[in-house]
């Protein structure tokens, strides 16, 4: 389909061309001439006196069409009746002037010119095709050298470069036997004579015969480009242009400004330069000017065309009169202000308005207040229609007048028009889909939009001057969709985690909390009431207070077997407030949900329970009532803040004095030289940190309780009614940390570089700060503000990349039928269950049957959606792990299936076909991005304390189990010594559920055994945190090798104890060169003095001591299994900065290789060390068959294994951050997914943000969508190329059907940016980043965009293939297939 017709406005609606794909390619000179309506010969634009376009110029009316509708230039033919006539005087065709937006011209170039994109867009495509370097091609193109195009019978090589002197010498030598050319002619000649098919054959043979990796890569790249040309039928020489298309003049307008000047598009300037130089060159060629002059002119022409296509890509950018680089064609389409992102993906829309928002506390959830003035403007066409229909106006003009005069009838009509016509409200930035919701408008006076308080959380709106935009859905379908899908009352749950997002906050929470708190000995305590009405009367006649404890008979509604509600009457001990609140409970919600002091969390649970038990409609009504009630009681409660509410604890002075004394003691120790400066600093920071916590605790204990006299006259404690405490406790506003600053002490502050200042601020805000304290505090405050600004931009960019990588992922079918999935367990860290199994599997589909561990019967069959009921049952039966389906293993080719995705979190049932789950996942991960921190944490003070733990204790009763990687030996004392690297002790409860999971380091001593029953608080294992031991797994007599005092080891004597030890010296520091290569090792001998071998092999046991190891055994000493040979001191708090927050999330999704990455074992086998090289150690792993795998590791890295140790494939052998690519390669997709999900979740968890694992898995699916072909088999792929997973699967299926050999492939992990750019859709990739590179590549490949994703369809202006658009696309597809079948059938019948 011709692209020009895609945007052709002259085609009538009936002629709308249907298209299914867009193809991009390189235009041949013939194509360019066929687009053109004439050649532009002159650089002139318009005549400055008559303002008419010059003939044959850049705005020529003859070529591009008339300037005025239906009027030729000289004015001979005017009006519609001459339509289609061409004026014989001025040559202009009489037609609409808007053809000037689409008619193109052309320039015939006097010399061919290379297209800069194919030359300079890296990797250079011209260079690839010709197998020449970019530098060489440039020298030819810009007339610095000749290139041999046809060597003839001479010894010259084709494509050889000759300088000018060389050329003339060779000319003298060989005469006309050879051909050499300069400039684009030379390159074009080379391209024209290149035999593509022959070259492909040669390359394929080379590919099979060569062994070197770099060569294979190089050949594969070249092969790919040549095959693309071969396939698409484009000619190589089209990359060199003979003819240049000229953009239609209305797309590069010339606008007269007042004062006789013109504002012009930069393109006109650029075209003018090209035409000038081209005409000059033509003249020079006619005059047969000297070579050197012609060459210079040709070079200038090449540069002018380069600037027109992509200014600044080569050399200096061309500048206009004001020294600013001119905007070229490439700049028009790329970047944020380019065509893609500015005009195609983000358009401004009519029927919209914006205004400030204020609170509408009396609204219902689905309503919003719309100012009358705004509504009148937005709904104008509807009002005109109604006015005409009711006969109040005869024409549109009359109707317009009525509306402008604002006659009373207009307001009545406006009311009618607006009724049941939803409008959409949007608050920028729209970070997730709840940033746009539909409401029914209520007309209000004033100029501000009124917003329902409960939807503020979704919009992230507050009323400090926020503005919102209003949009009107016009068509009936649009109104329907807005009402059913976007109405605020239909969006109660958050798509990110499936929890209610319509949750009361702030005042409402405070009001409800105040209403449901109980008071001891309040008026009327202990009264009995027959029903709620009686409580009402008592409360209004002031017989009882809100917090009075009473007993009341309540009627509740319970579902019976038939599913109908039956009343049940119960007596409850409760308070007056709670009894009053019970009135608004929906049917079927038990009273116990509100029979407690309602804090924010409880209210959230209440709404969630209401949604699950009573359904959407009742929940919305309930939420509204909660809001009205909450506001009412917040007003009646009159809770406010006074200075007296900030009670400073009496213990503060004593605690400060104690801390000061401790600090003084440390300072004294430092002066005596007992501790280093670093230790002193850490300890001081620690002391103040603890002091701050103690004061805060004292303050909270003091605030949270107050003494009262009960009915019997005794003094008792009750929860405090202190206003500040109530605000924090209810979750309405503020937190313990903030109260600490108000009435405790402010605590430690950080310097701008993130290090902690060791003198804390001991005052609080109530006491006031001194000048110095205030100054210290300003650092942090300012850094916070600067951080926020950066954070917003970074977070937005992350969201954009995430959306781009997942935008084409839509649920397209119900079930792909796979039984693959991942095994889900509870997330346990240290001793705590962070996320229970039930929360992880809720809303997923089982991949295999869930079996009861005790009875062995099937609880849930495979393929079942796990609802709340089912997960509760699984939870109670003690199932430890469940295999569930996941998007990562879904077999659907373009998109996902509903069963692999599971429940639609925002609707609470299985996801519908057409749901754009990719975009939802991206929004859910990106939206909280602004809440994440930006900083990298320096481990100091508190954190290093945690790092130096020396034991683990059980936190609950249960049974100890060792993880599968656990390896240990028993030493002579009978202690179990851990000799594995990734060992864990897991604690199970009585029914076998995992409760805790503790990591146990290498060298720890286990104090429990597998399967042993343990009590809470029991120590499981102990170890020395400051040294890392080296442990023998064999018994025998010690024999040292290369352990020479003063050469490889040094004797160190402890001053205090007088004991001496041997310490291994670093090879670099040793004196003689021979001793540098010596490695001190230990071997073991048996009683006969023979070397002991590793069991089952003939390799002797030999363990090398690492540098810095303190040797703890003596020559000839008898040692047993599990004994310590040496200890390696650990640098106690080596501050490795942890990347946290947003940068960490970005790092994970971009799949970056970490800075000092650790290393995993490539194979299972035995470790040994080879010969060291300079600064590197050689680590060798030998497997059972004796195959060795060796790697070089730099000396600075900490190797976690030692000689003779057995490691499993994928086990960590060198300390450092884990590289996700390694995990994928060595442990597989499931391990990788688990790693990324866990790491991402950890960042969000720290900020208290809940996101469903599902969303992260959707992103991971997209990161894994490409594979590397390891062996192409007989599928036609090229070995080493990256292709879509689905394409390989399809090709392999086909190959197997035909009995051919399928391709073997390896999984590849791509970062989200790379994955976005490597998508099949070039339109999507080009509109994302690196537009030039993407389009160049697509053009050469002759790519076809199937318009599968959402982005591509938005760009070409169609409905997106998601949601209601999916059905439209499907029905169109079926029609197409039907048409194709019909045509096929008719052909058959004709024959």
Swiss-Prot record:
The protein's Enzyme Commission number: 2.7.7.6
Cofactor(s) essential for the protein: Mg(2+); Zn(2+)
UniProt keyword terms in alphabetical order: DNA-directed RNA polymerase, Magnesium, Metal-binding, Nucleotidyltransferase, Transcription, Transferase, Zinc
GO molecular function, one term: zinc ion binding
Coiled coil spans: none
Keyword field contains Protease: no
UniProt protein name: DNA-directed RNA polymerase subunit beta'
Subunit organization: The RNAP catalytic core consists of 2 alpha, 1 beta, 1 beta' and 1 omega subunit. When a sigma factor is associated with the core the holoenzyme is formed, which can initiate transcription.
SUPFAM superfamilies: beta and beta-prime subunits of DNA dependent RNA-polymerase
Binding site for Zn(2+) 1: 72, 74, 87, 90
Catalytic activity annotation: RNA(n) + a ribonucleoside 5'-triphosphate = RNA(n+1) + diphosphate
Gene: rpoC
GO biological process, one term: DNA-templated transcription
Keyword Nucleotidyltransferase: yes
